[in-house]
Design a protein with these regions (language model features):
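Surface-exposed, low-hydrophobicity beta-strand/loop segments enriched in small/polar/acidic residues
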Residues: 1-143
Length: 143
């Protein structure tokens, strides 16, 4: 696992966004901006959405393992097609190289199901089907 969310390619970094009072976000999650311009977890499972991913904030001493809580600030990036990044795959999911992934509706990613919109393709296999599995970063290429 790399120590950074962005692995290669292009992106538009958006700095110092406030986390909404009801949100807890981690690097690698898919996010959205609410009507107040605050970060929230992208809330619609399998839907088309802006590819806005929470980043680690190394300038504040944060890593890919840190959590951002309500009222704090975080950096995010709009990831361009063809770019590679690590995203947070939901516990209980299993992907292999080449599987399409999409949002779960709570900020993490899942393997694409029928009638959902793909956001990225898995670049590595990850099996989180064990009962004690936790959300885990996995490398993807954004579509």
């Amino acid at each position: 696992m790399s120590n950074t969310i962005i692995l290669s390619g292009g992106y538009k970094k958006i700095q110092s966004l406030t986390i909404n009072s009801s949100a807890t976000l981690k690097p690698g999650m898919i996010a959205a901006l609410n009507s107040s311009g605050e970060l929230i977890a992208q809330a619609t499972e399998g839907a088309a959405c802006e590819k806005l991913v929470i980043l680690e904030d190394a300038l504040q001493g944060k890593t890919v393992n840190d959590t951002y809580t309500a009222g704090t600030v975080a950096d995010a990036a709009v990831i361009f097609p063809g770019s590679e990044a690590q995203v947070l795959l939901a516990a209980t999911e299993k992907v292999v190289v080449g599987d399409y992934v999409t949002g779960t509706g709570v900020g993490t990613f899942q393997k694409l199901e029928a009638a959902q919109v793909p956001l990225a393709v898995a670049l590595e296999a990850c099996d989180l089907t064990e009962s004690d599995a936790v959300d885990t970063l996995v490398a993807v290429r954004f579509l």
